[in-house]
Amino acid sequence: MADSTGLQFTVKVGALPENTFVVAEFALDEALNRPFNLRLELASAQPDIDFGAVLDQPCELLVWYNGELQRRVCGVVSDFAQGDSGFRRTRYQLRVLPALWRLSLRQNSRIFQAQKPDEILSILLQEHGITDYAFALKNEHAKREYCVQYRESDLDFVNRLAAEEGMFYFHEFEAGKHRIVFADDAAALTQGPELFFNLGNRSLEQGPYVRQFHYREAVRPSDVELKDYSFKTPAYGLSHKKVGAELTHQRDTYQHFDFPGRYKEDPSGKAFAQHRLDALRNDAVAGQAKSNCAALLPGQSFSLTEHPNGSLNTDWQIVRIQHTGLQPQALEEEGGSGPTVYHNEFGVVKASTTWRARIGSPEAPHKPMVDGPQIAIVVGPDGEEIYCDEHGRVKLQFPWDRYGSSNDQSSCWVRVSQGWAGGQYGMMAIPRIGHEVIVSFLEGDPDQPIVTGRTYHATNRPPYELPANKTRTVLRTETHQGEGFNELRFEDQVGQEEIYIHGQKDLNVLIENDAAWHIKHDEHTDVDNERVTRIKANDHLTVEGEKRDQIKADYSLTVDTSMHQKLGDSWLTQAGQEVHVKAGAKVVLEAGSEITVKVGGCFIKVDGGGVTLVGPTIKMNSGGSPSSGSGWGGKSPVDPLGVSVPPKPKVPLTPAQLATMKSAAPFCEECEKCKEGGCEI
C-alpha cells in the first residue's frame, strides 16, 4: 500500500504468492553494455521459504506512484540469502540479474566461420534459451571469416564482439519479461520523458524532474589511425584514419595509432577506425545528474528543460544509472518509519552521440591472447590425403575445439610457414591430413593462426627407428594415393658417412651448364632395363687401368666418319661364326713381319721370305666362287627422353594491378586491355 508520498514498491518471485515478500529497499544498477544488477532487501512473514522456489526463478520489481506503474524490472534470481528472523518478519536478500547473466556461467573455446556478428550473437543467446532479443542495426557488418571465442565466458565474448563491431546493448522491459536490444547508432534510442530542472523544492506531484545536473568536458584523443596487413595485398597499407568532432576546446594533435587494427579489408577498417574513435571519446562531452524519475533507463533519451544554462536544455541519452528505493514501513518489528523514497543518479552523453564501449573497460574486455604456440592436426575432406588452397594453406583441428568435426570445415584456411619463400621460388612442403603441426598466433591473436612447425607423435613415427639411427638426417616423402616414397638421406656416423637417394619412380636432373663428378674410389651402376645416352658434342673417355665390356646380345657401333683404333700390343678378336669386313673402296692389311690366313689345314702365309700357299689343291683362275658375308645389320640408338624445364607459375597480377596494390586506389579485376598492357587507366 502506498504511503503519503504515493510511492510503493512491490515484488513477485517465481510461482510464490504475490504477498510473500514486501520490499524494504532496493538498489538497481543499469548501464549500456552491462547486465543490470538489482539488489533487494525483503521481508516476509514466512521464516522458511524454500530456496528452490526462489533461486534461478523469474523475479519482477514494480515501482508505483499513486497507483500508476512507473517502472518494472524483470530478471532472474541469482543469489538468495535468509537474514534475521523476528516475531513476525524474516529478512531476505535477493540479487536479480538479466537472463543474459547466464552467459557468464559458461566458459568456452570455439570457432565461428563465415558468419555475421549478429548471427554469432544469436547463436550464443539461443544456446542459453534466450529468444527475446532484437537487433536495431543501422550499419552493415561484414561476415567474419574466422572468429574465435577463446577461454572466455560467453558473456565476455558477447561484450567483446559487440564492442569490436561498434555495437552496444540495453534492456527493455514488459510484463514478466525483458528484451535485449543490440544497436550500433544513436538513432536506435527510444525517446523518454521531458524532465524539468528543479531549482527549488517542487514535489513529485508537479511531475518528474532533474534536481542536479553537472556538465563536463574532457580532453580525449582527437583522431584515430589504424593500420593492418593482409598477405593477399602485401604492398597495400590498409591504413584508415578518422577525426573526431567537437574539438574546439582541445588540440587536434592527440592521435591514437594502433597496429594491428584487426581487419583485412577496407570497409571493415573504416568502420573499426570510427568505432575506436567513438569509444575513446565516449565521455569527452558528458554529464552527471540526479532525478526522481524511475522511468529512466539506458538506451533511452530525455529532454532537459528549465536549466539556467540554456545550452544544456537539449536531448541527452542515459549511458548508466543507479536507482535507490527505501520503503521502511516493511520492517514493522524494527520500528520502520519514515516515508517511502526513491531517487537515482545517472550519467549522460548527448543524444546525438553514438556511445560505444572502450575496449579494455568493464563493458568490453580485451580479446584473450594465446600464451604460446599450440598443437593442431591437419584435416580435410574424406578421401583426401593432401588438402590445400592456391596459397598452400591448410585446415586444422585444434584439441580445444569441441565443435569441430576434423574435416574441411574445422577451421579457416591457415597459412603455413616454409623454410624459404620468395617470388615464385623457395620451398614448399604441404602438411598432409593427419599430420601434427605447431601453430603460432600473430600478435597472440586467436583469430590469426599460422603453422610454424611440424612434430611427430605416437602414431606418426619418424622414418627410422630412434635412437638407433640418430646419426641420420632424412627427408622422406610418401606417395600420394599409393604406396611408396621418395627419400634423401644423410648418414653421419663416422666410417659410414653416406648420401642416399631413393626415387619411387623417376629421377630427372637438369643442369643448365656444366656438371662435374669426382669419385675418389669405386662407382657402381646397375640399370635393370635400358640406358640411353646422347652426347651432342664430343665424348672423351680415359681409362688408366683395364676396361671390360660384356654384351649378351648384339652390339651396334655406327661412326659417321672414321674410326681410329691404336693398340699398344695385340688386337685379338674371336667370333663364334663369322667375321665380315667390307670396305667401299679398299681393305689394306699390313704387318711388319707376317700375315697368315688359315682355314682348316690350308693357309696362306706372307712373310719376309715370300708367299707360302699350303692346301690339298691349289686353284688359280679356275673353279669356285667368293663367299659373301652377312653384311652390316646394326641398329641406330634411340634418343633419350630428355628433361624439360618446369614452366614458371603464372604471374597472378599484371603490372597495372601491382601498381594499384602499392597505392591506396581501389582494387578490382583486370580488363582485357590490362592483360595486353594497353588500358588507358
Curated annotation (Swiss-Prot):
Region described as Disordered: 621-640
Location of the protein in the cell: Secreted
Predominant location: secreted
GO cellular component, one term: extracellular region
EC number per UniProt: 2.4.2.31
Gene3D superfamilies: 2.30.110.50, 4.10.220.110, Baseplate protein-like domains, Gp5 N-terminal domain
Entry keyword set: Glycosyltransferase, Nucleotidyltransferase, Secreted, Transferase
Keyword Secreted (UniProt): yes
Reactions accelerated catalytically: L-arginyl-[protein] + NAD(+) = N(omega)-(ADP-D-ribosyl)-L-arginyl-[protein] + nicotinamide + H(+)
Chain's role: Part of the type VI secretion system specialized secretion system, which delivers several virulence factors in both prokaryotic and eukaryotic cells during infection. Acts directly as an secreted effector with an actin ADP-ribosyltransferase activity that disrupts the host actin cytoskeleton, leading to a decrease in host cell viability and an increase in apoptosis.
Family under the similarity heading: Belongs to the VgrG protein family.
Protein name in UniProt: Type VI secretion system spike protein VgrG1
Source species of the chain: Aeromonas hydrophila
